[in-house]
């Protein structure tokens, strides 16, 4: 909280804003990983809740209450998280030049499959809006990307042997063997998802950015209700729209 550069986020800030990355639909939100905290309330009193083990809650779970409170309840000084092992490796399947309907179908089909995916995002090239230039080619300069256009990205993580087989299964289940696809290996996959997580797709925009959480089945309908007047992309398989 008191060290590091001011333009970097903090763990307390992430908890206070209840912000989750692209893995959220698989591993849960940050609210699901906070076990306990210490902080100072508006009266200068030290507040402590929770503990250091998973089954520690007696009474009201204040750890969940502070998530998304934007610092209005307590200034956090110490947080205990439940953490998971980092994946050994990852690969990302990129399907090129898809419109919103087939992209939403591919993401939904992937999430509901048995291939245990951990990322599902659609980055469109439309609509073209004055003053809001989003250049996918400049944002995602990766050697393994074979061509330009919209990107439908699906990530698989785990052991190398498991990933290779699950990737083959996914490609066969989506029936995209003959379509324009790219596969990002571990290093480029990490770069790609860091850019997605950090909203670099909007880095050249001076406009306000809205965050909308919706049922995945409603994402296509929402885009058409907005009459393609706004630049967007959706994450979490369509459950999160920016």
Predicted stretch roles:
Residues 1-242:
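Noncatalytic alpha-helical scaffold of FAD-dependent oxidoreductases
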